[in-house]
Amino acid sequence: MMNSKLEQDLQTCLSMIRADWKMQNNYLDRQTNFIYRCDSLEKCLEQIRIAGVEKEYALHRWYNYMTSVACEYLFCEFGAVHDNDVYNHDVDIYINGIPFDVKLTIYPAKLSHRPYDLKTRTGKNEMIKWYYANQSQQSRKQMLNRLYVVCDGKDAYECLIMKSDFKLLREKISSFMRYSLNNGINEIDIVDNGITYHLKSDIIYISYN
């Protein structure tokens, strides 16, 4: 799935979008759901033309979706195995046979005061607990093993840049995989509705600092 053409497409797409896109809404999402069937920028632009939808909204969704997919396959370059079912929303990859959901995300705006130092184990574990506590109710009920690739830029546009900075992503993910294949994945207890879940979860911190 991961190839140089896709990397080039994502870089080109990045130059066509701004960071301050409008808030997602169900109506525009339904209009632009074709993005999930477009494996290239060319196909996405063609579908935008055919559907007559807002170009930047569709491109922004395609960029976020395809960078997330690309991120999953970066793990596979360094020893993970991708799930055979591309429609499986619960499992993206396996590391040493253990299933994981991969989330490419940004440092949450709600935590703009930076309460957690993601360069430390304690900070990462506190952030992981925050992520699980602030998921949608549907996701919380599943309580899956998760790997969070967290982009921490100086602003929203730098976070967008980081999502397709494959040199930096490969560097951080390869380092994580080398350690994890030899030492296992961080384990953490998450309490939800009085029930304790013992999960494997970690954060791969992406920053230019």
Regions found by a protein language model. Name each.
Residues 1-89, 104-209:
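Nucleic-acid endonuclease domains
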Residues 93, 98-106:
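Conserved catalytic cores of phosphodiester-cleaving nucleases, focusing on short active-site segments
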